[in-house]
Amino acid sequence: MSVAASIYLPQFTIGETAFDGFKNEMGKFGNRVAVIHGERAWKASSQYILPALEKAELSVTGTVLYGHEATHRNAERITEDPCVREADMLLAVGGGKCLDTVKLAADHLGKPVFTIPTIASNCAPITKISIMYHEDGSFCDIPRLAQVPVHCFIDPRVILEAPVCYFRAGIGDAMAKFVESQWSAKAGERLDYGSELGITSGSMCFYPMLRDGEKALHDLEKKQVTEELENVILNIVISPGIVSVSVHPHYNGGIAHALFYGLTSRKHIEENHLHGEVVSYGTLVSLMLDKDFEKLSNVYEFHQAIGL
């Protein structure tokens, strides 16, 4: 008898009217929402989010600063907050560390969580894992969660307010997802459906970046919402997330991220380099070890062009 397998694919909305979907998506779970956010993230996005919540007739039980690091203690503190306990659902607003912290808190509480990424730098807005750190910023562990976030809302105007360095690093992180999953599946064993789906989808993290990445970066610098910019945002946030939630854990990682976890145990690297910057170096190492010199050359030239 076969073993049951489930895949929960992410749902998302992107566009300057993305928050108009609050009522349809969040209203299914009640009308009380606690907003947990990063400090800079809230300053950049609250002008769009609060009116949209009011328009959707959703009552905000409170706004809570998540902390400054994705730690288990911060997740516990969120679960203990009265406005969070009172809420029907949680809305996480911020970067990857904020979203992972809120996702873990929601998992502990058994409450639905919605996400609004304010930077395009990783797939945390839609995955069912949380990458957690110690108070000093060193890597701790990766708890697996019961569910993916219910819905991810992406307003590109919010992404435009973030420093360009996060977007650049996000491109590097996404491209690693394709290289790592391809490498991990090289043993030749028959893939289960989910793994084949995820690894095939992983090409969206790579080839469109080579095509659109440089222009999208320039568009971001000029604060212009373009088709290329939105495509790259989706291929940073959504495409690698589809890989993550679909593939068997054996294929969800590789040399690039292993190097990241090792290198960031060095304080000067953890403090001075973004996740995607370190991972992009690991991508080059992975391609070198794989002797895929054509991809190595293409990726190296692309990294040089965008400043990775």
Could you tell me what each predicted segment is?
Residues 3-7, 18, 292-308:
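C-terminal charged capping/lid subdomain of soluble metabolic enzymes
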Residues 42-46, 97-103, 123-126, 252:
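Short glycine/serine/threonine-rich phosphate/pyrophosphate-binding segments
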